[in-house]
């Protein structure tokens, strides 16, 4: 299955594409816990799917989806209680895994076509919340995520050891109709202790200011 978005093609990957998946998932090898290690990959093939972004015939990014209520969710190392973090049960959520991208395409917004894919898959699977998690040690395109309707919900660890940014968005959000909020707080991205505290108080980061500080609201 292929979908065209501007100059990029998004295509589902299958078992025969395993070398491509392993090429990108090796970026996790430097972390203590790898949620897409070779022994865990079959779980995603069975309960979710891998997708790649192609520039012509060249693969430039890879992501995956996984139903949050699947039995293998815990095997990703995520001990999160989504109901506590998001106010939604796992059965309503579609996990959208880290988006690996080639370094030479740095600065290219792959999130816009990929989020369209995630939304389509959420609709097919009757999920109304997209949950996207990104290793805090890896470069994160906060602005593209915010532009595509995601909010930063928390900084949480995989296997209680590897910190990940946890983003979420409702599938019915209209990103060009964001209401005004009076209770807005600013926090530097580097101040992880303070931003975690704000998230625990119910604040959600939704944008960045000109100095690249996170803007929180609740």
Identify the function of each model-found stretch.
Residues 48-67, 76-78, 206, 217:
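Conserved beta-hairpin
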Residues 93-94, 122-136:
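Conserved GNAT acetyl-CoA-binding A-motif
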Residues 1-39, 45-54, 59-60, 179-186:
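Short amphipathic alpha-helix that is part of the acyltransferase structural core
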Residues 124-126, 136-155:
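Conserved active-site alpha-helix within GNAT-family acetyltransferase domains
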Residues 61-98:
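Conserved acyl-donor/pantetheine-binding loop and adjacent beta-alpha core of acyl/acetyltransferases
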Residues 133, 149-166, 204-211:
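Conserved catalytic-core motifs of GNAT/GCN5-like acyltransferases
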Residues 131-142, 187-189:
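Conserved beta-strand-loop-alpha-helix junction that forms the acyl-donor binding cleft
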Residues 98-101, 106-122:
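Conserved acetyl-CoA-binding loop-helix of GNAT-fold acetyltransferases
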């Amino acid at each position: 299955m292929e979908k065209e978005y501007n100059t990029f093609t998004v295509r589902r990957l299958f078992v025969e594409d395993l070398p491509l998946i392993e090429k990108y998932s090796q970026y996790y090898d430097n972390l203590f816990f790898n949620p897409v290690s070779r022994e865990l990959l079959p779980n995603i093939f069975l309960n979710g799917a891998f997708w790649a972004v192609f520039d012509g015939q060249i693969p430039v990014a890879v992501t995956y989806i996984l139903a949050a209520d699947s039995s293998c969710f815990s095997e990703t190392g995520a001990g999160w209680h989504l109901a506590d973090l998001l106010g939604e049960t796992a059965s309503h959520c579609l996990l959208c895994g880290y988006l690996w991208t080639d370094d030479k395409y740095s600065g290219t917004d792959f999130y816009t076509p990929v989020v369209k894919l995630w939304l389509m898959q959420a609709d097919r699977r009757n999920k109304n919340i997209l949950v996207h998690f990104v290793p805090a040690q890896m470069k994160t395109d906060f602005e593209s995520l915010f532009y595509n309707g995601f909010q930063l919900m928390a900084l949480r660890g995989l296997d209680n050891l590897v910190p990940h940014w946890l983003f979420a968005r409702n599938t019915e959000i209209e990103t060009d109709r964001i209401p005004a909020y009076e209770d807005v707080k600013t926090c530097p991205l580097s101040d992880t202790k303070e931003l975690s505290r704000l998230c625990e108080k119910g604040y959600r980061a939704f944008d960045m200011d000109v100095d690249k500080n996170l803007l929180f609201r609740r």
